[in-house]
UniProtKB/Swiss-Prot annotation:
Transmembrane segments: none annotated. It catalyses: O-phospho-L-seryl-[protein] + H2O = L-seryl-[protein] + phosphate; O-phospho-L-threonyl-[protein] + H2O = L-threonyl-[protein] + phosphate. Residues 536-636 form the PH domain. Protein phosphatase involved in regulation of Akt and PKC signaling. Mediates dephosphorylation in the C-terminal domain hydrophobic motif of members of the AGC Ser/Thr protein kinase family; specifically acts on 'Ser-473' of AKT2 and AKT3, 'Ser-660' of PRKCB and 'Ser-657' of PRKCA. Isoform 2 seems to have a major role in regulating Akt signaling in hippocampal neurons. Akt regulates the balance between cell survival and apoptosis through a cascade that primarily alters the function of transcription factors that regulate pro- and antiapoptotic genes. It is found in: Cytoplasm; Membrane; Nucleus. PROSITE patterns: LRR, PH_DOMAIN, PPM_2. Residues 1-25, 41-118, 136-156, 252-470, 1458-1510, 1673-1717 are annotated as: Disordered. Residues 1175-1422 form the PPM-type phosphatase domain. This is PH domain leucine-rich repeat-containing protein phosphatase 1. It is a peripheral membrane protein. It comes from Homo sapiens (Human). Residues 1076-1205 are annotated as: Interaction with NHERF1. Keywords: Acetylation, Apoptosis, Cell membrane, Cytoplasm, Hydrolase, Leucine-rich repeat, Manganese, Membrane, Metal-binding, Nucleus, Phosphoprotein, Protein phosphatase, Repeat, Tumor suppressor. SUPFAM superfamilies: L domain-like, PH domain-like, PP2C-like.
Length: 1717
C-alpha cells in the first residue's frame, strides 16, 4: 500500500495549479496515503536497519515552506499578481481554507476524501489543459528545490536530493535547459530613468527563492544599501509576486535617493556621462571586489533555526506589496535587532511577460563549473532565511515533520537525521533546518530529537537565535560567498565592473542593469542548491540498467534513475524515479569497465568479496564519456582522503569529523577564515582532531592569519597555505618537526621567524610571489632544503654571500624579480649550486664563473650583453631573448647537450661550440651570423640545428658525413645548398630552407639507389624552377613537401608517381596549369594545397581515399569533375577565387555535404557592392589534429553601408569561443556606437560586454581577438576615414603606410613591465612557461573569467587617420605573427593585387615557416585618395555636405534612397562581385578603336600654366580629381535594358562595337579608369588640361563637340554631371561619342524584370580618328579652345570669393570629361 501511495504522491506535481485546485478530494486522498506511507517508512528508517526512504508528510497549509508554490489567502490580503506561465485562472482568488497541494508533495486536508484512483482516472483529461508556459507554477522543476523539505524523499536520500534529481540531469543537457521557462522581471523605462538620475544608484539582479517560482528579480538600490537590507526586504515580500524592488537603505546617500527624481529630458540612451556631483565620486577601481580586501569575521555560526523568542518572525500586518501602488513601505521584521530597517518601495510599473525568458538563461543555460549551479531553480533554504510562512496567514497546527535519513557513504559511516522544523505558537512561523555544505552526504550527529505531539514538535533544548538574512555573491560561476550584513552589493558589483575595464561610473551603471551580467557576478537570496546541499550529486539521469551478469537472460534492461552521489552509485528500484527502494553501490576501491558488446555501455562494480555489478547503457556518447571519466576518478580515491575544494565552505562541516583517520584533506578555494565567533565544532581549531593527517591544503582561502591549530597536528608532512593574504608566520610553526613541504606562495610575507630552523626535515619551502627583498637568513639553518623558490619577489641585488652560507641549496629560482647585479664578496666558488634560474630580470651582464659546478643556467629575457659561464659540468644553457654579442664558456663544456642562444646579436658561432662532443640541440636562430663552421656538422652527437633568421650566404661546401636529423636554415641569403648535403646527411629527416634565394637543389644520390630518409622538405619562397622537380624522386620516403611561391610551371607526372608516401603537398603561388593525374598513386595523401596558380582542370584528388583538405582557390577552374561518392574523410574544399567556375545544381548539392566547402557567391543584381575605398580577403587554416580554432569576421557594409568591420579570433585549443566572438561581436559594436562616438570608449566597452556575452563558455575557456573598425566622420570638415584597432591576446593588426609597417596592436604578456606589476599585486602564480596559473600567456584576453582579476578583457586601442599613403592592413592570429614578422608580412603581400590571394599567401608562408597552430589572416586593401572623402558642396548657398561618403551601394535602389535630393550617390567597384552602376561611375573613356585599351602611360603635365589647381579640394568618387601616376582598371558588368531607349534604333540595326557587349537587352562595358595621384598638391592639375600621350592608334576626338562660343549653363544640383537626365533614363546626349562615360544625376528607372533603361549608344561613325602626325597641331587647337572657354566664364561675385572658394572651383568644371586615348 505504501508504494502505491507514494506513486500517487509522485504524480501530483505533474498537474497544473488550476487542476490541482479543482480536485480537493483526490488531493486529500493522496495526502492521507502519503502520510500513512511516511509514518511507516519513517519508523523503519528510525531503526537504522537500512538506508530506505522516509517520506515526510506535507507541511501545514498555513505555512508552506520556502519552496511552496500555492498558499492560502489571509483575510484582507490582496491576491498575488498574475505570474507568467500559469494556467488559466492562475491569478484567481481561491476561497479561504481551500486545501492546496504543495509542489512536489500532497496537499493536507482535514479528512480523507475519495481514493487516489479518481485522480488517476482524471489525469489524462487534466493533462490536456497543461501548457509549456505553466511550468513556472505547476511543474516540479519550478519548485522542486524550494519544496525539498516537503516532498517525499528517496531511500537514503534527503528531500532535496529527490527534488533536484531531475535538475542535476538537466544541468548536463543544454538542449533540455534551453527549453526551461524561467521568467525574469524586466526593468521598465521608468526604472532605468530612476537609476540614471543619480550616479549613486544602481541595480543588482538577485535570484529570489522566496517567490512562488524562482525569479531573477531586479533590485534598485544605492551604493549605501547593505546586503542585510536587501535580504530583509526580499524576505518580507516572500511568495508575493511583486515587481521590481527598491531598497534605499539608511546610508548618507539614501536621503538624496529617496527624493523623487524627475525623468531626464532625453528618452534615448545617453551619449555622454552625466556630470557627477561632488559627493558622487566613482569608486576606486582598485577597491576590493566581492572577494577582495581583508577577511571579515562572519556572523555567528549558522544554527538550526526554530521559532520562539529571539527568532525572526513574520508580522501579521499586511505586507508592503499589499499596500497601494506608489505608497512607500517603511518597515521590516518585528524582531530584527541586527539589521537596520530599510526604507523600501515597489516600483509601480513592472513587466511579467509570459514569453520573456531571461537573457541570462539564453546565454547561460547550464550550471557552471566548480560545483556551482547557475540555475535559479536550484536554490535551497538558507540557514539565515526567515520564516517560510506568509505574513498574516494563520498556521494550522499538527502535521509534524519527520526527518530524512541520508545515504551512507565512505565519509559518513553513520546516517544521521536532519534537524526538524519547529512550529511555535499560533501565528508564529514555521522553521526549517538549514542544509549543510556540499561537503558530505550526511548531517552531523547530535541533532534535535523530535516528538510528535498534538500541537507540533517539542524541542529538547532551545536553539540559539538565527542570524539575520543576507545575500550570497558568486563570481564567474564558481564558489559562492555569503555577504556580511553590512556589505554593499551595488558597491561590490561596481568594483567588479571597474576591474574588468569600464572607465566611467555611468557606463558601469548601465551594465549593471543588464540581467546577463549573471555569468560574471551574480547575487542570490538564499544559498544556491549546489553549494548548500547536504549531498554531493555529481551526475544523474534516466538510463537503461541491468543488474548481475550479462550472460543471465533473466535480468532484462529496465529504465531507472541513476545518481552518482559522492562516492556511491544510487539506482532506483522502480520506474517512478525515487519513490521506491534505492540500491547503493559504493565505488571506492571498485572499478568501471567498458562493455564492448553494447553501445555506450559501462559496467560498475563495487569492491569486496560480495561485490555487485550494474550495467548501465547511456543514450549518447557524450554522456557515456562523462560518466566514465567521473566514476573512474571516484573509484581511484582512497577512503582516507577527502576532497572538499571549491565547496564555498565558510566553516568546517560537522560530518567531516566522522572519520578521525583522515590522512589527506583538501580544502582549497573556499572561504575559510580565522573567526573566533565560530563554535568549536565548526572552526579551524578543530583541525587538530585529525591526529593522523599527513597532507593539508588550505590554499586560496581567506585566512588572513596563519591557523595555529595546524601546528598541533604532529603527523603533518605537507602544508599548503598559499594565497591567503598572510603577512606573517607565527613562531609556533617550529613545533612541526615532521613537516617536509611548506608552501607559502602568493602572500604578503617579508620575513620568516627564526623558529623555522627547528624543522629539520623540511625539504621544500615555497616563498614565491611574496614581498621579500632579500634571501631570509633562517634558510641557513634549514639544512634539508635543497631548492630556494623565491620567484616573483622584490629582490634587486643578489648577494652571493647569503648563498654561500647555505651549502645545502642546489637549485636557486629567482626568476621574475628585479635583480640588476650580483655581488660577490669573496672569491670562493659556490660549488653547491647546480641550477640557477634568473629569467625575466634586469641583468646587463652576468659572470657565472663563480658557479663552478653549474649544470643548468636560465637567463632568458634579460638585457645581457656578455655572458661568462663555467663549463665543467654545464649540461643546458638557456640564454635567448637578450642582446648577447659575446658568449664565453670555459673550459669546453663536455657535458653540454642543449644550448639556446636565439634572438640575440651574435655574429658568429663560438669555437668552443664545435668542440662540445655531447651537444645534441643547438638553436642560434634570429641572430646576425654570417657563416657556420664546417666542424659544427662533424659533431657526431648533433641532432638538431636551428640556424634560421640569420645572414648566411652559404653553408660549408664539402661536408663530411653528419648526424644532423633536423636542419632549419630558413630566412637566410642562401643561393644554393652544398652539393653533397643530401648525400652525406643520410640521417636527415627534416629540412627547411624556405625564404632564401635557392635556384636549384642538390641531388640525393648519384645512382638510382638512394639512402635518403628525408620525410619533410620545406622550400617555400625561393626561386626554384622545373629543373628541381626530378631531384625530388631521390627521396622516396618524403611525406610533406612545400614548394609554394617558386617558379614552377609544371610538375611532371612521372616524378609525382614516384612519391608514393607523400601525405601533404603545397604548390601554391606558382604558374602550374595542372596537377598531374599520377597524384592518384599517392594513396596516403590527405592535404593538397595549390592555390594562386593557373590550374584550369580539376585534379584527380577526389579519388584519393585519405584526402581531407583540398585548396584550389585563386585559379582558373571552369568546372569540377567529381566521382559518384565523395571521399569519406574529406573535410575541406576551397574553390574561391575561380571566376570562370560554373557548378550545376547536382554538383553543388553533392559538395554541400562537405563540412567546410568554400565557393564564391554568385553576383546578382541586388547583391551588395564591394567598397570603392577598401576590399578584403581572408583565409583560415586548421592546426593540430585538424581543429580549426580560429575565426574571421568581415563586414564590408557595417552600420548602414558607411563603415567596415574586420576581426580575427583565436581560441588556441578551443573552437567554441572563436565562433561565439565571430557571431556576436559586430552586434555589440553596433550597439556601443549608439552610446558613444569616442573610438577608445566604444572599442573598450565592446570587448568588456563581449566578456559577458560569452556566458558560461567564457568562464573556463578564452580566446584572443583583434577588431578593426573603419569609420567615416561626416562632421569632420576633412571628411576623413578613421581606422581603429583593438586587440587582446596575441592577435594583432599592422598597417602598411608608405611601404612600411605601422603596428596598431600590442601583446600584453609577462615581458610588459606594467602588466607584470599588476599580476604580482593580485598574487597570481606565474608558472615557468610564463603563463598565469599555467593557463594563458596573455594577461588581457577574452574569457578565462576564473582568472579574474589577474586576466582582464580590456583591450589595447589605437586609432589612425587613413591617408592616401595607406595601402592595406593585415589582421592575423597568434600563429601568423609567431611565424612572420610585421616587416615580412607587409613585404609579402604588398605586390599581390588580390586581397584573397594575399591572405592565402600569408597563411601558406606561416605554415611553411613552421607554424602548427590554426591560422587566420584578413587582408584589407585600401584605396584612400583625396577624392574619397565626399565633401563636395551641394549648392552655392553653402549646403551641408552629405552625411557619409556612401561608398557601399548594394544596389541602385539603395543609392537613390540614401542620396540627398540634390546630390549624387557615391560609386563602388566590386571586389568579388559586379556592381550594377560601376560603368556609370568611370572617370575615363574607353577607346573605340578595335582592340585598343587605355594607355598605361601616365598623362603628361597640363598645357596651361594658368589653370586653377582644382585637385587641392577634397572630392567624392563621383567628382574625382585625377592625380599623376595612378592607373586602375575596373571591370564592370553593368546590366541595362534597351526597352526604354529613345534613339529610334533597334538593337539589330546597330553595328557591333568593340568593348561593348550586348545581346539586345544587356550591355556589358569594360572600363579603364585613369585616376592619377600626385605627391605634392601644388603640382596637381585638373583632368581637363591633361590629355593623354599619343598612342600608336592616334587620338580619339568626338565629332560633335560643342561650339567654342556657346556658353554653358552651370548646374549646381548635379555638380560635375555631363548632361541632363532624359525621361528614358539615359544620361549622355545623343550627339556625344559613345566613349564618353557619364555620371547619372539619378539612377536609371528599374523595370519590374530587374533590368535598367539603357542610355542611347551613338554610332561609331560619328567620330573620327586623327593620325599621329597631326597630334601636335590638334593639341594646340584644344589648348586654344579651352582657354577661350575659361575666358568666357564670368567670375563669381567678390563677396562670395572668401567664403566659398570651392564653389568658384566647381563653377569652372565642364559638363563632361573627355580624355583622348
Amino acid at each position: 500500500m505504501e508504494p502505491a501511495a507514494a506513486a500517487t504522491v509522485q504524480r501530483l506535481p505533474e498537474l497544473g495549479r488550476e487542476d490541482r485546485a479543482s480536485a480537493p478530494a483526490a488531493a486529500a486522498a493522496a495526502a492521507a496515503a502519503a502520510a500513512a506511507a511516511a509514518a511507516a517508512l519513517a519508523a523503519a528508517a528510525g531503526g537504522g536497519r537500512s538506508p530506505e526512504p522516509a517520506l515526510t508528510p506535507a507541511a501545514p497549509s498555513g505555512g508552506n515552506g520556502s519552496g511552496s508554490g500555492a498558499r492560502e489567502e489571509a483575510p484582507g490580503e490582496a491576491p498575488p499578481g498574475p505570474l507568467p506561465g500559469r494556467a488559466g485562472g492562475a491569478g484567481r482568488r481561491r476561497r479561504r481554507g481551500a486545501p492546496q497541494p504543495i509542489a512536489g508533495g500532497a496537499a493536507p486536508v482535514p479528512g480523507a476524501g475519495g481514493g487516489a484512483n479518481s485522480l488517476l482516472l482524471r489525469r489524462g483529461r487534466l493533462k490536456r489543459n497543461l501548457s509549456a508556459a505553466a511550468a513556472a507554477a505547476s511543474s516540479s522543476s519550478s519548485s522542486s528545490a524550494a519544496a525539498a523539505s516537503h516532498s517525499p524523499g528517496a531511500a537514503g536520500l534527503p528531500a532535496s536530493c529527490s527534488a533536484s534529481a531531475s535538475l542535476c540531469t538537466r544541468s548536463l543537457d543544454r538542449k533540455t535547459l534551453l527549453l526551461k521557462h524561467r521568467q525574469t522581471l524586466q526593468l521598465q523605462p521608468s526604472d532605468r530613468d530612476w537609476v540614471r538620475h543619480q550616479l549613486q544608484r544602481g541595480c543588482v539582479h538577485v535570484f529570489d527563492r522566496h517567490m512562488a517560482s524562482t525569479y531573477l528579480r531586479p533590485v534598485l538600490c544605492t551604493l549605501d544599501t547593505t546586503a542585510g537590507e536587501v535580504a530583509a526586504r526580499l524576505l518580507q515580500l516572500g511568495h508575493k509576486g511583486g515587481g521590481v524592488v527598491k531598497v534605499l537603505g539608511q546610508g548618507p546617500g539614501a536621503a538624496a535617493a529617496r527624493e523623487p527624481a524627475e525623468p531626464p529630458p532625453e528618452a534615448g540612451p545617453r551619449l555622454a556621462p552625466p556630470e557627477p556631483r561632488d559627493s558622487e565620486v566613482p569608486p576606486a577601481r582598485s577597491a576590493p571586489g566581492a572577494f577582495g580586501g581583508p577577511p571579515r569575521a562572519p556572523p555567528a555560526d549558522l544554527p538550526l533555526p526554530v521559532g520562539g523568542p529571539g527568532g525572526w518572525s513574520r508580522r501579521a500586518s499586511p505586507a508592503p506589496s499589499d499596500s497601494s501602488p506608489g505608497e512607500p513601505f517603511v518597515g521590516g521584521p518585528v524582531s530584527s535587532p541586527r539589521a537596520p530597517r530599510p526604507v523600501v518601495s515597489d516600483t509601480e510599473s513592472f513587466s511579467l511577460s509570459p514569453s520573456a525568458e531571461s537573457v541570462s538563461d539564453r546565454l547561460d543555460p547550464y550550471s557552471s563549473g566548480g560545483g556551482s549551479s547557475s540555475s535559479s531553480e536550484e536554490l535551497e533554504a538558507d540557514a539565515a532565511s526567515a520564516p517560510t510562512g506568509v505574513p498574516g496567514q494563520p498556521r494550522r497546527p499538527g502535521h509534524p515533520a519527520q526527518p530524512l535519513p541520508l545515504p551512507q557513504t565512505a565519509s559518513s559511516p553513520q546516517p544521521q537525521q536532519k534537524a526538524p522544523r519547529a512550529i511555535d505558537s499560533p501565528g508564529g512561523a514555521v522553521r526549517e533546518g538549514s542544509c549543510e555544505e556540499k561537503a558530505a552526504a550526511a548531517v552531523a550527529p547530535g541533532g534535535l530529537q523530535s516528538t510528535p505531539g498534538r500541537s507540533g514538535v517539542t524541542a529538547e533544548k532551545a536553539p540559539p537565535p538565527p542570524p539575520p538574512p543576507t545575500l550570497y555573491v558568486q563570481l564567474h560561476g564558481e564558489t559562492t560567498r555569503r555577504l556580511e550584513a553590512e556589505e554593499k552589493p551595488l558597491q561590490i558589483q561596481n568594483d567588479y565592473l571597474f576591474q574588468l575595464g569600464f572607465g566611467e561610473l555611468w557606463r558601469v551603471q548601465e551594465e549593471g542593469m543588464d540581467s546577463e551580467i549573471g555569468c560574471l557576478i551574480r547575487f542570490y537570496a538564499g544559498k544556491p542548491h549546489s553549494t548548500g546541499s547536504s549531498e554531493r550529486i555529481q551526475l544523474s539521469g534516466m538510463y537503461n540498467v541491468r543488474k548481475g551478469k550479462m550472460q543471465l537472460p533473466v535480468n532484462r534492461w529496465t529504465r531507472r534513475q541513476v545518481i552518482l552521489c559522492g562516492t556511491c552509485l544510487i539506482v532506483s528500484s522502480v520506474k517512478d524515479s525515487l519513490t521506491g527502494k534505492m540500491h547503493v553501490l559504493p565505488l571506492i576501491g571498485g572499478k568501471v569497465e567498458e562493455v564492448k558488446k553494447h553501445q555506450h555501455c559501462l559496467a560498475f562494480s563495487s569492491s569486496g568479496p560480495q561485490s555487485q555489478t550494474y550495467y548501465i547503457c547511456f543514450d549518447t556518447f557524450t554522456e557515456y564519456l562523462r560518466w566514465l571519466r567521473q566514476v573512474s576518478k571516484v573509484a581511484s580515491q582512497r577512503i582516507s582522503s577527502v576532497d572538499l575544494s571549491c565547496c564555498s565552505l565558510e566553516h568546517l562541516p560537522a560530518n567531516l569529523f566522522y572519520s578521525q583517520d583522515l590522512t589527506h584533506l583538501n580544502l582549497k578555494q573556499n572561504f575559510l577564515r580565522q573567526n573566533p565567533s565560530l563554535p568549536a565544532a565548526r572552526g579551524l581549531n578543530e583541525l587538530q582532531r585529525f591526529t593522523k593527517l599527513k597532507s593539508l591544503n588550505l590554499s586560496n582561502n581567506h585566512l588572513g592569519d596563519f591557523p595555529l591549530a595546524v601546528c598541533s597536528i604532529p603527523t603533518l608532512a605537507e602544508l599548503n597555505v598559499s594565497c591567503n593574504a598572510l603577512r606573517s608566520v607565527p613562531a609556533a610553526v617550529g613545533v612541526m618537526h615532521n613537516l617536509q613541504t611548506f608552501l607559502l606562495d602568493g602572500n604578503f610575507l617579508q620575513s620568516l621567524p627564526a623558529e623555522l630552523e627547528n624543522m629539520k626535515q623540511l625539504s621544500y619551502l615555497g616563498l614565491s610571489f611574496n614581498e621579500f627583498t632579500d634571501i631570509p637568513e633562517v634558510l641557513e639553518k634549514l639544512t634539508a632544503v635543497d631548492k630556494l623558490c623565491m620567484s616573483g619577489n622584490c629582490v634587486e641585488t643578489l648577494r652571493l654571500q647569503a648563498l654561500r652560507k647555505m651549502p645545502h641549496i642546489k637549485h636557486v629560482d629567482l626568476r621574475l624579480n628585479v635583480i640588476r647585479k650580483l655581488i660577490a664578496d669573496e672569491v670562493d666558488f659556490l660549488q653547491h649550486v647546480t641550477q640557477l634560474d634568473l629569467r625575466d630580470n634586469k641583468l646587463g651582464d652576468l659572470d657565472a664563473m663563480i658557479f663552478n659546478n653549474i649544470e643548468v643556467l636560465h637567463c632568458e629575457r634579460n638585457q645581457l650583453v656578455t655572458l661568462d659561464i663555467c663549463g665543467y659540468f654545464l649540461k643546458a644553457l638557456y640564454a635567448s631573448s637578450n642582446e648577447l654579442v659575446q658568449l664565453d664558456v670555459y673550459p669546453v663544456p663536455n657535458y653540454l647537450s642543449y644550448m639556446d642562444v636565439s634572438r640575440n646579436r651574435l655574429e658568429n658561432v663560438p669555437e668552443w661550440v664545435c668542440e662540445s662532443r655531447k651537444l645534441e640541440v643547438l638553436d642560434i636562430g634570429h641572430n646576425q651570423i654570417c657563416e657556420l663552421p664546417a666542424r659544427l656538422f662533424c659533431n657526431s652527437s648533433l641532432r638538431k640545428l636551428l640556424a634560421g633568421h640569420n645572414q648566411l650566404a652559404r653553408l660549408p661546401e664539402r661536408l663530411e658525413r653528419t648526424s644532423v636529423e633536423v636542419l632549419d636554415v630558413q630566412h637566410n641569403q642562401l643561393l644554393e645548398l652544398p652539393p653533397n648535403l643530401l648525400m652525406k646527411a643520410d640521417s636527415l629527416r627534416f629540412l627547411n630552407a624556405s625564404a632564401n634565394k635557392l635556384e636549384s637543389l642538390p641531388p640525393a644520390t648519384l645512382s638510382e639507389e638512394t639512402n635518403s630518409i628525408l620525410q619533410e622538405l620545406y622550400l617555400t619562397n625561393n626561386s626554384l624552377t622545373d629543373k628541381c622537380v626530378p631531384l625530388l624522386t631521390g627521396h622516396p620516403h618524403l611525406k610533406i613537401l612545400h614548394m609554394a611561391y617558386n617558379r614552377l610551371q609544371s610538375f611532371p607526372a612521372s616524378k609525382m608517381a614516384k612519391l608514393e608516401e607523400l601525405e601533404e603537398i603545397d604548390l601554391s603561388g606558382n604558374k602550374l596549369k595542372a596537377i598531374p593525374t599520377t597524384i592518384m598513386n599517392c594513396r596516403r595523401m590527405h592535404t593538397v594545397i595549390a592555390h594562386s596558380n593557373c590550374i584550369e582542370v580539376f585534379p584527380e584528388v577526389m579519388q584519393l581515399p585519405e584526402i581531407k583538405c583540398v585548396d584550389l582557390s585563386c585559379n582558373e577552374l571552369s568546372e569540377v569533375t567529381l566521382p559518384e561518392n565523395l571521399p569519406p574523410k574529406l573535410q575541406e574544399l576551397d574553390l574561391t577565387g575561380n571566376p570562370r567556375l560554373v557548378l550545376d545544381h547536382k554538383t553543388l548539392e553533392l559538395l554541400n555535404n562537405i563540412r567546410c566547402f568554400k565557393i564564391d557567391q554568385p553576383s546578382t543584381g541586388d547583391a551588395s557592392g564591394a567598397p570603392a575605398v577598401w576590399s578584403h580577403g581572408y583565409t583560415e587554416a586548421s592546426g593540430v589534429k585538424n581543429k580549426l580554432c580560429v575565426a574571421a569576421l568581415s563586414v564590408n557594409n557595417f552600420c548602414d553601408n558607411r563603415e567596415a568591420l574586420y576581426g580575427v579570433f583565436d581560441g588556441d585549443r578551443n573552437v567554441e569561443v572563436p565562433y561565439l566572438l565571430q557571431c556576436t561581436m559586430s552586434d555589440i559594436l553596433a550597439e556601443e556606437l549608439q552610446k558613444t562616438k569616442n573610438e577608445e570608449e566604444y572599442m573598450v566597452n565592446t570587448f568588456i560586454v563581449m566578456q559577458r556575452k560569452l556566458g558560461t563558455a567564457g568562464q573556463k575557456l578564452g580566446g584572443a581577438a583583434v577588431l578593426c573598425h573603419i569609420k567615416h566622420d561626416p562632421v569632420d570638415p576633412g571628411g576623413s576615414f578613421t581606422l581603429t584597432s583593438a586587440n587582446v591576446g596575441k592577435c594583432q593588426t599592422v598597417l602598411c603606410r608608405n611601404g612600411k609597417p605601422l603596428p596598431l596592436s600590442r601583446s600584453y604578456i609577462m615581458s610588459c613591465e606594467e602588466e607584470l606589476k599588476r599580476i604580482k599585486q593580485h598574487k597570481a602564480i606565474i608558472t615557468e612557461d610564463g603563463k598565469v596559473n599555467g593557463v594563458t600567456e596573455s594577461t588581457r584576453i577574452l574569457g578565462y573569467t576564473f582568472l579574474h582579476p589577474s586576466v582582464v578583457p580590456r583591450p589595447h586601442v589605437q586609432s589612425v587617420l587613413l591617408t592616401p599613403q595607406d595601402e592595406f592592413f593585415i589582421l592575423g592570429s597568434k600563429g601568423l605573427w609567431d611565424s612572420l614578422s610585421v616587416e615580412e608580412a607587409v613585404e609579402a603581400v604588398r605586390n599581390v593585387p588580390d586581397a584573397l590571394a594575399a591572405a592565402k599567401k600569408l597563411c601558406t608562408l606561416a605554415q611553411s615557416y613552421g607554424c602548427h597552430d590554426s591560422i587566420s589572416a584578413v587582408v584589407v586593401q585600401l584605396s584612400v585618395t583625396e577624392d574619397s572623402f565626399c565633401c563636395c558642396e551641394l549648392s552655392a548657398g553653402g549646403a551641408v555636405p552629405p552625411p557619409s561618403p556612401g561608398i557601399f551601394p548594394p544596389s541602385v535602389n539603395m543609392v537613390i534612397k540614401d542620396r540627398p535630393s540634390d546630390g549624387l550617390g557615391v560609386p563602388s567597384s566590386s571586389s568579388g562581385m559586379a556592381s550594377e552602376i560601376s560603368s556609370e561611375l568611370s572617370t575615363s573613356e574607353m577607346s573605340s578603336e578595335v582592340g585598343s585599351t587605355a594607355s598605361d602611360e601616365p598623362p603628361p603635365g597640363a598645357l596651361s600654366e594658368n589653370s586653377p589647381a582644382y585637385p587641392s579640394e577634397q572630392r567624392c568618387m563621383l567628382h574625382p580629381i585625377c592625380l599623376s601616376n595612378s592607373f586602375q582598371r575596373q571591370l564592370s558588368s553593368a546590366t541595362f535594358s534597351s526597352a526604354f531607349s529613345d534613339n529610334g534604333l533597334d538593337s539589330d540595326d546597330e553595328e557591333p562595337i568593340e568593348g561593348v557587349f550586348t545581346n539586345g537587352s544587356r550591355v556589358e562595358v569594360e572600363v579603364d579608369i585613369h585616376c592619377s595621384r600626385a605627391k605634392e598638391k601644388e603640382k596637381q592639375q585638373h583632368l581637363l588640361q591633361v590629355p593623354a600621350e599619343a598612342s600608336d592608334e592616334g587620338i580619339v576626338i568626338s565629332a560633335n563637340e560643342d561650339e567654342p562660343g556657346l556658353p554653358r549653363k552651370a548646374d549646381f544640383s548635379a555638380v560635375g554631371t555631363i548632361g541632363r537626365r532624359r525621361a528614358n533614363g539615359s544620361v549622355a546626349p545623343q550627339e556625344r561619342s559613345h566613349n564618353v562615360i557619364e555620371v547619372a544625376t539619378d539612377a536609371p528607372l528599374r523595370k519590374p524584370g530587374g533590368y535598367f533603361a539603357a542610355p542611347a549608344q551613338p554610332d561609331p561613325d560619328d567620330q573620327f580618328i586623327i593620325p599621329p602626325e597631326l597630334e601636335e597641331e590638334v593639341k594646340e587647337i584644344m589648348k586654344h579652345h579651352q582657354e577661350q572657354q575659361q575666358q568666357q566664364q564670368p567670375p563669381p561675385p567678390p563677396q562670395l570669393q572668401p567664403q566659398l572658394p570651392r564653389h568658384y572651383q566647381l563653377d569652372q568644371l565642364p559638363d563632361y570629361y573627355d580624355t583622348p586615348l
